[in-house]
Design a protein with these regions (language model features):
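C-terminal beta-strand-rich structural cap/linker in extracellular carbohydrate-active enzymes
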Residues: 411-429
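Active-site-proximal helices and loops of the catalytic beta/alpha 8
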Residues: 171-264, 269, 297, 316-350, ...
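Aromatic/acidic polysaccharide-binding cleft in carbohydrate-active enzymes
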Residues: 267-333
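Hydrophobic faces of well-ordered beta-strands that scaffold small-molecule active sites
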Residues: 13-15, 46-48, 99-101, 168, ...
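Short catalytic-loop micro-motif centered on adjacent basic/acidic residues
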Residues: 100, 167-173, 281
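Substrate-binding/active-site clefts of carbohydrate-active enzymes
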Residues: 2-15, 19-44, 50-162, 183-192, ...
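Carbohydrate-binding surface patches
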Residues: 359-395
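Solvent-exposed beta-strand/loop surfaces of large extracellular or lumenal domains
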Residues: 401-415
């Protein structure tokens, strides 16, 4: 983590909004009436997926992908005007929340303003054509950060937006040089000293493949020096295998413990069950009792919690990045009361100083997780199948309040009965 990172971020909740999909109108101003609801279940920060104009050349689908950015310094007219966006941010601030925007600094659309004015800022293949370095991203071309004038342009754009919003989610941050991010953080600090920096660090396999092909890819340990928090994609592939039954729960909990062992004391991983690049969790975990446990476990994990808009309704459909597909608010499911309790517990029981440990019962797919602070020892018990079981827990015998369900749980002989609902118990010091 950056030396000046606010550890309080670890107890906060980010809510990810795709403007096109969030309302039937798909505009900035249409989001304003929804802000009170978003805040009501514990949201601290709203992250907007890219708000900039989308390129036409090579676009995917009828509307194009928001990550094929045409102009870093303006907003997508389909969403509204810059004044509309500023009004939205003002309303977010009025409710005590913060706003972040996506910055896509690895690439642009082929017809971007930047390519039209400065083609020398871009990567070119062996035939001299603008291209992307690898991956199936036919609607974008990669930037070339060996050109220091590009740094100046990008940093000036960041300084501009830092005067409006509270932070940046940096797309494919690992593929942009460490030195650039370090310079950008220093420059932006002059405009907004409290700016939040979130890195979309890349999957382990993608980083290895990039280096195999001769391209630099920033490692997570480097990213922690200049970002406040980063994705947990270093172990996401293990998590995905767990979700689909291709590895035991203990493999993933071992990876969580490995992160705790190797990263700086103040490390912060953004934890999510789903995001715009991943399938909806409710499309995989279809049993509601099980989904409640997975959701409770998400909030217990060490790190900032991410909720992707629609997750609170257990929406099973992943909105297309290339079309207009409003999220489904009529699923008949409502996880917001649960999320409100979990967010409150995260803020009141956990701290940015906590240490973490996790164990697993593979046969019953049951996780027991611990958080340790100077004030309390917290234990979470999560039955990921939603089934009842007798569970061994690292707590003295006695009665404990379940901070999720509100019921009392008794520990006898170092064991308790889990009825299939998530448990959060605390031993005060």
């Amino acid at each position: 983590m950056a030396i000046d990172t606010d550890r309080g971020l670890q107890t906060q909740v980010i809510y990810s909004v795709y403007v096109r999909a969030h309302t039937p109108e798909g505009t900035f101003r249409a989001i304003i009436p929804d802000l009170d609801r978003i805040r009501s279940f514990g949201t601290d920060i709203i992250w907007f997926m890219p708000i900039h104009p989308i390129g036409v050349e090579g676009k995917k689908g009828s509307l194009g992908c928001p990550y094929a950015n045409r102009d870093y310094r303006s907003v997508n007219p389909a969403y509204g005007t810059l004044e509309d966006f500023k009004a939205l941010v003002d309303e977010i601030h009025a409710r005590g929340m913060k706003a972040m925007i996506d910055v896509v600094y690895n690439h642009t659309s082929p017809d971007s303003v930047l390519y039209e004015t400065h083609p020398e800022y871009f990567y070119h293949d062996a035939q001299g054509r603008p291209a992307n370095r690898f991956g199936d991203w036919a609607d974008v071309i990669d930037l070339d950060y060996s050109n220091r004038e590009l740094w100046d342009y990008q940093i000036e754009s960041l300084r501009y937006w830092a005067g409006i919003v509270d932070g940046f989610r940096c797309d494919v941050a690992s593929m942009v040089p460490y030195g650039f991010w370090k310079a950008a953080r220093t420059a932006v600090k002059q405009v907004n000293p409290a700016c939040i920096w979130l890195a979309e660090s890349i999957h382990l396999s993608m980083g290895c493949e990039a280096r195999r092909l001769g391209f630099a890819a920033m490692r997570d340990s480097e990213a922690f020096d200049v970002f406040d928090l980063e994705y947990d994609y270093d172990i996401r592939e293990v998590f995905d295998r767990l979700l689909h039954g291709r590895c035991p729960l203990s493999h993933w909990t071992d990876m969580l413990n490995y992160q705790e062992a190797i990263y700086p004391d103040n490390y912060n991983k953004m934890r999510c069950l789903e995001n715009h690049d991943q399938p909806r969790i409710a499309s995989i975990i279809t049993d509601m009792e099980a989904l409640v446990n997975w959701t409770a476990m998400l909030y217990f994990l060490k790190g900032t919690t991410l909720i992707y808009a629609g997750q609170e309704w257990a929406d099973r459909h992943q909105p297309s990045l290339f079309e207009r597909e409003p999220i489904d608010r009529e699923t008949g499911m409502n996880l917001m009361p649960l999320m409100k309790k979990l967010a409150a517990a995260k803020k009141t029981l956990f701290t940015g100083e906590d240490s973490f440990w996790a164990t697993a019962d593979d046969a019953r797919k049951l996780a027991v997780m611990e958080r340790f602070s100077s004030r309390r020892h917290s234990v979470g018990v999560f039955s990921l199948l939603g089934e009842s079981a007798k569970v061994k827990v690292p707590l003295p015998d006695g009665e404990y309040l379940n901070h999720i369900g509100g019921n009392t749980v008794r520990v006898e002989g170092g064991r308790l009965f889990c009825d299939g609902t998530p448990l959060l118990l605390c031993e005060e010091k």
